Regions:
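Loop/helix patches that line or flank the sugar-binding groove of alpha-linked glycan CAZymes
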Residues: 1-105, 111
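Short helix/strand-capping connector loops at secondary-structure junctions
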Residues: 32-34, 123-126
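Surface-exposed charge patches in extracellular/virion surface proteins
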Residues: 81, 112, 130-134
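Beta-strand-rich binding/interaction modules
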Residues: 104-124
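C-terminal beta-strand-rich structural cap/linker in extracellular carbohydrate-active enzymes
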Residues: 129-146
């Protein structure tokens, strides 16, 4: 929490630590080798952490409910694998389903009043699916419903 400098490491834009745009590590950070590689290593991989964050920002910007909405945690639909919540803004609602597990999981969100999958994030070729109120979530995926 307060003392976690390794969690605040900057993006490796290059494998050359003296390249333009490279940041110094935060004070107190050890000599941690980042396992995801540099921008050059990640830019062409659609499932890289770089592209995941880029897509996350794009989705947030596309849906005001995500950026500015009020949050309701759907505890009855959440468990040790899935986190489900709704966000509402100006009369519009989205449902966000996060699978934080390395295993696939399903969620029945038919009672939340949404009918369409409008965005997703995935960390592999396996994509989330939504049909008849059931979200099928591969490992480490996110599904946005509206």
């Amino acid at each position: 929490a307060a003392n976690d400098p390794e969690k605040r490491l900057g993006m490796l834009w290059s494998d050359d630590s003296s390249a333009e745009g490279m940041c110094d590590d935060p004070e107190g950070a050890g000599n941690v080798e980042q396992e995801n590689g540099s921008y050059d290593d990640q830019k062409d991989d659609p499932y890289s952490i770089y592209n995941f964050v880029k897509q996350t920002i794009s989705i947030r910007n596309a849906f005001p409910e995500i950026a500015r909405g009020t949050n309701t945690f759907e505890s009855s639909l959440s468990d040790d694998k899935l986190c489900v919540f709704t966000r509402e803004y100006n009369g519009q609602k989205v449902v966000m389903i996060f699978n934080t597990s390395q295993e696939s999981a399903k969620a029945d969100v038919s009672g939340l009043g949404v009918s369409n999958a409008v965005a997703m994030l995935q960390t592999s070729e396996d994509a989330p699916e939504y049909k008849d109120g059931i979200a099928e979530m591969p490992a480490y995926s996110v599904l946005i419903l509206k």
